[in-house]
């Protein structure tokens, strides 16, 4: 960073401390209001200078920056702690698929605890004033945690892809397999982060810290190509390809139709093929109630199927993803419970008689063609929106920084604003703030767990088994 943007860092060759508030107006007859409004001569360490509104603006900007960065750090810590706590506390979230989510939350929490605070000090002071040793530690932690966070997204996308495209995957998705993926993610991130500490640094690394007060990861061109390719560009390509294949597979299955079978015929006297009529008003109410319940269940299951296939955090992901291979159910309902004696146990239809006037109790398909097509379009839009949020947030947060990281060592004459470089860096960090939101907001299990953690509520799940 350019260290000349705030008073006290204009001359890096002198060991001059940053002036305190009392030094600003030592030996002068003007106040803060005078300095802001009119400007006046003040004495700082025996040197007369002109305090203007620019100096105060810099001070206000520094204060605002401190508050904003502190809020980002706090939000990142709280969000990822909530995710980890929810998985630890809630038994229905303790499944192998959510181990990847927990590991991602740990990586993002490390970004918030190890990387962001020192980065905030760097931004507020407008220069690295903590020495080469802490710079090495900070850059290594930065690369380790940020790379692990990004590579976890690849592991999550891979897990989803296997779950959607391989019907047998849920049977081999065990702890050993998921833990192997987690170890590979952290191992790759560790290799990239330790390479500069093992000697892969550019010649100006130390001079940049001591003379220019800039703490940057190694600007060696070969290392930057290796690091950016292995921790962003290749993972980005993999994520885009996998999510596109997931979307294509899910859309193809959503659009798959099966013509409903013809309703079972009834005899002239209103009896079903089994010869057992449904005669009473009580029976009619029973049939109607069972149909409405099953219709709700059917619609909910179809609506959630694609979302469960696309999202990693469904507590019931194993059972829900299974349903992706099933055709949408548009036939008449099935009664699988005990029925009154006068109700036919036939699965497809039954007939209700009221006195001499028979009534067909065969329930039509839950949706007509037009309604079905509308529902399919709605589910496809939801799938596209979900994937757009997941991939869009990742690309939006990290792409500017990694373009800059690759351009800087290649183009030695290119000048990138320090403010722009800081913004791109913190935009990448902000992805660790968004991850706990993006990867849990679509899961009702996580939402209920967060509510219980926040409000101590223990709401019974309103899921009915049929």
UniProtKB/Swiss-Prot annotation:
Topological domains on the Cytoplasmic side lie at 90-99, 159-177, 251-386, 443-466
Spans traversing the lipid bilayer:
67-89, 100-121, 137-158, 178-200, 229-250, 387-410, 420-442
Enumerate composition-biased segments (Polar residues).
Answer: 10-21
Q: Which residues are glycosylated?
A: 2, 10, 29, 41, 45, 50
Subcellular location as annotated:
Cell membrane
Reply yes or no: does the keyword ATP-binding apply: no
Membrane topology designation: Multi-pass membrane protein
Name any one Pfam family assigned in the record. 7tm_1
The segment annotated Disordered runs over: 1-21, 255-282, 339-360
**Which biological process terms from the Gene Ontology are attached to this UniProt entry?**
adenylate cyclase-activating adrenergic receptor signaling pathway; positive regulation of MAPK cascade
Q: Per the similarity annotation, which family is this?
A: Belongs to the G-protein coupled receptor 1 family.
Descriptive protein name: 5-hydroxytryptamine receptor
């Amino acid at each position: 960073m350019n260290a000349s943007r705030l008073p006290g860092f204009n001359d890096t060759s002198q060991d001059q401390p940053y002036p305190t508030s009392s030094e600003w107006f030592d030996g002068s007859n003007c106040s803060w209001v005078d300095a802001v409004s009119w400007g006046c001569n003040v004495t700082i360490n025996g040197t007369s200078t002109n305090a203007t509104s620019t100096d105060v603006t810099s001070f206000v900007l520094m204060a605002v920056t401190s508050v904003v960065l502190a809020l980002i750090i706090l939000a990142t810590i709280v969000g990822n702690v909530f995710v980890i706590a929810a998985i630890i506390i809630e038994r229905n979230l303790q499944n192998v698929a959510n181990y990847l989510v927990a590991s991602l939350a740990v990586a993002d929490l490390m970004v918030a605890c190890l990387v962001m605070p020192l980065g905030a000090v760097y931004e507020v002071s407008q220069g690295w004033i903590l020495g080469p040793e802490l710079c090495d530690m900070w850059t290594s932690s930065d690369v380790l945690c940020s790379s692990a966070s990004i590579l976890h997204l690849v592991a999550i996308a891979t897990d989803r892809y296997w779950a959607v495209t391989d019907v047998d995957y849920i049977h081999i998705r065990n702890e050993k397999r998921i833990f192997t993926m987690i170890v590979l993610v952290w191992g790759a991130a560790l290799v990239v982060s330790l390479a500069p500490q093992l000697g892969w640094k550019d010649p100006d690394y130390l001079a940049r810290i001591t003379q220019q007060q800039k703490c940057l990861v190694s600007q060696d061109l070969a290392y930057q190509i290796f690091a950016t390719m292995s921790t962003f560009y290749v993972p980005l390509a993999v994520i885009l390809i996998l999510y596109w294949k997931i979307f294509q597979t899910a859309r193809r299955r959503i659009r798959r139709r099966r013509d409903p079978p013809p309703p079972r015929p009834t005899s002239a006297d209103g009896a079903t093929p089994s010869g057992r009529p449904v005669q009473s008003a009580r029976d009619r109410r029973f049939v109607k109630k069972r149909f409405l319940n099953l219709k709700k269940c059917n619609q909910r299951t179809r609506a959630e199927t694609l979302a469960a296939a696309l999202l990693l955090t469904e507590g019931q992901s194993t059972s829900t993803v299974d349903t992706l291979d099933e055709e949408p159910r548009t036939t008449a309902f099935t009664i699988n419970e005990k029925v009154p004696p006068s109700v036919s146990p036939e699965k497809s239809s039954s007939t209700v008689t009221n006195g001499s006037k028979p009534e067909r109790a065969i329930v039509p398909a839950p949706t007509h063609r037009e309604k079905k097509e509308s529902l399919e379009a709605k589910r496809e839009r939801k799938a596209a929106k979900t994937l757009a949020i997941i991939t869009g947030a990742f690309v939006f947060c990290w792409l500017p920084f990694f373009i800059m990281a690759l351009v800087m060592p290649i183009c030695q004459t290119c000048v990138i604003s320090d403010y722009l470089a800081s913004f791109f860096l913190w935009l990448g960090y902000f992805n660790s703030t968004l991850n706990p939101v993006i990867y849990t907001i679509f899961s009702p299990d996580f939402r209920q767990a967060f509510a219980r953690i926040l409000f101590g509520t223990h709401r019974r799940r309103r899921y009915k088994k049929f």
